[in-house]
């Protein structure tokens, strides 16, 4: 190779190699620090678009929908079951009130218990309210729908049930009393029909709640699969990166030494003119 004081090609090549080593070391250190193989879109655009968060499916989980967490955890079904239990207790009071041999005091005591159970029933219905909606008291104008796919093209619908007093399911009223055997007999007839209808309504709510819960489970598993797939694309292999870093740490001083040697090459020209 010709020696020249104007152009030092070996030094330029050595500098390029050293710069490349420094860039590689910076890239390796970034991957180690972030844990990601892809840190910017310019690295690999197609893979960068799948970085964590880009394909998040959590929006489909029913727990992220208003009120759905309360439904699939059983608030609606549990409230309905409580209504059914209260109706059974009321039935015991009504059956006892049909006894014609009861004293007035005993009958009044039974009626007081009956009225207290009606108040408890209303309280249970009010407790089924969440996020401004109530599944059981008939105050909600329309059924509740929840997003079921990423394109918002499908929904899971929860059919509401009206278990409030004086409705089509619960025909009891707040003014009912069991102060005499005749009233008690009439209340018992409506109460038996109400109990059957309430149990059916609660069963429907439970079935739909299971559907929502199953959807939650499916979305959670799907999210895990997506997260694993994305991780395979963007996560850095730290074992490999550690090996690369050690190699570059050796390569970097060697490159600096090569550049130093190349920079000193023009000095050889001076020796050609000495001792003449």
From Swiss-Prot:
GO terms for cellular component: bacterial-type flagellum; extracellular region. Signal peptide: none annotated. InterPro entries: Flagellin, Flagellin_C, Flagellin_N. It is found in: Secreted; Bacterial flagellum. GO terms for molecular function: structural molecule activity. The keyword Secreted applies. Residues 61-75 have a biased composition (Basic and acidic residues). Pfam families: Flagellin_C, Flagellin_N. Keywords: Bacterial flagellum, Secreted. Residues 51-80 are annotated as: Disordered. Belongs to the bacterial flagellin family. Flagellin is the subunit protein which polymerizes to form the filaments of bacterial flagella. PANTHER family: FLAGELLIN. In C.crescentus, the flagellar filament is composed of multiple flagellins of 29 kDa; 27 kDa and 25 kDa. This is Flagellin FljJ. The lineage of its organism: Bacteria, Pseudomonadati, Pseudomonadota, Alphaproteobacteria, Caulobacterales.
